[in-house]
Amino acid sequence: MFAGLPSLSHEQQQKAVERIQELMSQGMSSGQAIAQVADELRATHTGERIVARFEDEDE
């Protein structure tokens, strides 16, 4: 379970996707780009936060 994940509006999600695509177009791997954008969001987000739980479906 992860607590304190930023709750993003559709517009904020779209901007995050565009930022990831920009970083990838500059040669960054998708994993690195996602991690960097996630770090940026956590550092700058001032809105609500959600609690999320991720489970492996393979298990």
Swiss-Prot record:
<dbReference type="InterPro" id="IPR005371">
    <property type="entry name" value="UPF0181"/>
</dbReference>
<dbReference type="Pfam" id="PF03701">
    <property type="entry name" value="UPF0181"/>
</dbReference>
<comment type="similarity">
    <text>Belongs to the UPF0181 family.</text>
</comment>
<protein>
    <recommendedName>
        <fullName>UPF0181 protein CKO_01169</fullName>
    </recommendedName>
</protein>
